[in-house]
Amino acid sequence: MVLLEFSMSPFDKGASVSEYVARSLDIIDKSGLPYQLTAMGTIVEGEWDEVMALVTACFKSMSRDCERISTSMKIDFRAGKRGRLKGKIQSVESKLGRTLST
């Protein structure tokens, strides 16, 4: 299983790009894959091909009307381990003995 953290935004659409980010989030939400939106990007959990197809779909949507796109990705692969999107946070919280702000 893969945890993929990524952000994608156009460089040629000015300072406010939430319209374009929202389009990507619509694609991510409709994918059915577990995800977590953060202020700086989105974390998605799935098989390699699933998460890469999701990035491709977001890119294709954005490239319809954007000439320059910045994408950052960080990938964590762990064979056979599911539920890490929440499990990694729960593991840290259990060691601290309290719930953290997420």
Named regions from a protein language model:
Residues 1-102:
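Charge-rich, low-complexity N-terminal segments
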